[in-house]
Amino acid sequence: MTIRAVVRGVGHYLPDRVVPNSELEAIVETTDEWIRTRSGIERRHFAAEGQTTSDLAARAARAALEDAGLQPDDIDTLIVATSTADLTFPSAATMVQAALGMTRGFAFDVQAVCAGFVYALANADALIRSGQAQRVLVIGAETFSRLMDWNDRATCVLFGDGAGAVVLEGTESAGTSADRGILATDLHSDGRFKDLLYVDGGSSTGTTGHLRMQGREVFRHAVEKLAETAHTALEKAGLGAGDVDWIVPHQANLRIISATAQRMQVPMDRVILTVQDHGNTSAASIPLALSVGKARGQIKEGDLLVTEAIGGGLAWGSVVLRW
């Protein structure tokens, strides 16, 4: 028998404030048409003043626990994927642990920017397979609205805030690709491309930084690397693109998503899309899409999913799982 990390529950949380493209027209030189044409984004959510990343994460976590029928102390390990933790330290994960009232297990953050949730899933899968954890709560949460340079129309219109969470549980299986759970993971990074997407301050610099991005170069790397890592993960699982029920991509922008799907030879009607409503929520985008996809009735038990993401670093990767 094989131990598989099976999804037992999902949940998400979006801040109350919805910011349509029309609102950004008053802040920066842009138009609704310009934003939609280049990104597919129509609106995004912004956290309220005083609302932190860990606040969003805790709300999503509670929703996922409820969906799984579990209590906080049923969880062995809590992982938060984020680039916008409340403080330099302690970790956002320990703050969420406290907010949930967890009194057992351990918690830590994963920082791989937009690829963070994929990295966190891979970590959770390894912990479960090795027997170090039975139930892992994996959260992606971000408040990227606080990193924006509101004079840079190429970036400030793209990002939003939100959180999504998944509960994974170790379950015995026959170890076939038909069994539920995470089937394969594939992770990469290449620091040579660190200047393509970064924040120019913060942390130990003692300054306040803003997000900087070379959009054309990021697009080129994203489409190539996302399709490649997805195919690699599928090969590890003994599967191909034709077996995929849903691609659940990092919701960076519609152009990257559609170009990657085309390169993978997967039609867009098999791609979960939320970017139009959420914008780019970095590490939160995939768990948000998983939760929304389930709520819409798109993702069903037994479906084969591929999640793929790329972020600053550059860091990228994919996970193949049977829902």
Swiss-Prot record:
A UniProt-annotated Pfam family: ACP_syn_III
EC number: 2.3.1.180
Region ACP-binding, residue ranges: 251-255
GO CC annotations, alphabetized: cytoplasm
GO molecular function, one term: beta-ketoacyl-acyl-carrier-protein synthase III activity
Transmembrane segments: none
UniProt entry keywords in alphabetical sequence: Acyltransferase, Cytoplasm, Fatty acid biosynthesis, Fatty acid metabolism, Lipid biosynthesis, Lipid metabolism, Multifunctional enzyme, Transferase
Enzyme class: transferase
GO biological process: fatty acid biosynthetic process; secondary metabolite biosynthetic process
Pathway this chain belongs to: Lipid metabolism; fatty acid biosynthesis
Active site: 114, 250, 280
Localization annotation: Cytoplasm
Coiled-coil zones: none
Reaction(s) catalysed by this chain's protein: malonyl-[ACP] + acetyl-CoA + H(+) = 3-oxobutanoyl-[ACP] + CO2 + CoA
Stated family: Belongs to the thiolase-like superfamily. FabH family.
Assembly, per entry: Homodimer.
Role of this protein: Catalyzes the condensation reaction of fatty acid synthesis by the addition to an acyl acceptor of two carbons from malonyl-ACP. Catalyzes the first condensation reaction which initiates fatty acid synthesis and may therefore play a role in governing the total rate of fatty acid production. Possesses both acetoacetyl-ACP synthase and acetyl transacylase activities. Its substrate specificity determines the biosynthesis of branched-chain and/or straight-chain of fatty acids.
Entry comment, domain topic: The last Arg residue of the ACP-binding site is essential for the weak association between ACP/AcpP and FabH.
The protein's name: Beta-ketoacyl-[acyl-carrier-protein] synthase III
